[in-house]
UniProtKB/Swiss-Prot annotation:
Key words of the record: Ribonucleoprotein, Ribosomal protein
Residues in coiled coil: none
Protein's recorded name: Large ribosomal subunit protein bL33
Family statement drawn from the similarity comment of this UniProt entry: Belongs to the bacterial ribosomal protein bL33 family.
Gene symbol of the encoding locus: rpmG
Origin superkingdom: Bacteria
Extent of the signal sequence: none
Length: 54
């Protein structure tokens, strides 16, 4: 049986609107700090920074 992998599922949230609409995965060995990605916000109708919540 395979062991637990290095990738974790993380939820991305926006501080301005409180949205938590993106789910992605990251390698916890390569990126131990919180993940920040620019994604589209449907409420603001523009691309903003979404930060790791979980």
């Amino acid at each position: 049986m395979a062991g637990k992998g290095q990738r974790d599922h993380v939820i991305l949230g926006n501080d301005q609107t409180g949205e938590r609409i993106y789910l992605t995965s990251k390698n916890r060995r390569n990126t131990p700090d919180r993940l920040v990605l620019k994604k589209y916000s449907p409420k603001l109708h523009k691309v903003v920074e979404f930060k790791e919540v979980k």
